Amino acid sequence: SRTATHSMTTINPAVGASGNDGKSGIFWGGGDLNIEDATLWIGNRIDGQRDDYSIILRFVNVTIPQGATINCATITLRGEETDSTSGLAATIWGVDADNPSFPADYDAAEALTHTTATASWSNPAVTAGSNINTPSISTIVKEIVDRAGWASGQAMILVIENNGSSAGVYRSFHSYDSNASYAPVLNVD
């Protein structure tokens, strides 16, 4: 039997609206989802006050055919502050759903269904105003577009989650609300 494969052209959708990126985390012991802040944080920002901040990114109109071959995929983020503390560890995963909406609140963010595929990111130092790419997330994107219900033009959510960073170790990136031209970008080839 023959399996059809779909060739990919390079696409680069950016987060295109205020409600499509945000940070989720614990603040003073309670959950918080902030979608209108200018800064996206990954890590443990303030000792004893904020833990496990993660970034949630929703890319709309992702024009990848169902079942397409994914050669390379990354996310480009723009540094908002210069952060060079060592030890930031993050895990990147996707939302295992067809055309997902951005979560309405912290509880909905915590309930998102993870892809089986993940990518580890030992995040290097970030310089304000400079772009940084994640490691390859090809297997994550491939798992999403291989879903039976996936269709070209749907939305895709990717999450960059703090994975045990020490207190005071974090990275700051621009959100759509900070400057739309600096919004996170999904790169797929």
State where each predicted segment sits.
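Extracellular fibronectin type III
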Residues: 1-6
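Flexible, small-residue-rich N-terminal segments that precede or flank a structured functional core
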Residues: 7-63, 96-102, 107, 111-122, ...
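Extracellular/periplasmic catalytic domains that process cell-envelope and extracellular macromolecules
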Residues: 50-51, 69, 83-85, 149-153, ...
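A short beta-strand element within beta-rich, extracytoplasmic domains
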Residues: 59, 69-81, 186
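Low-complexity, serine/threonine/proline/glycine-rich extracellular segments that form mucin-like
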Residues: 63-72, 86
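Beta-strand-rich interaction/scaffold domains
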Residues: 79-152
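Ser/Thr/Pro-rich, low-complexity mucin-like regions
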Residues: 143-180, 189
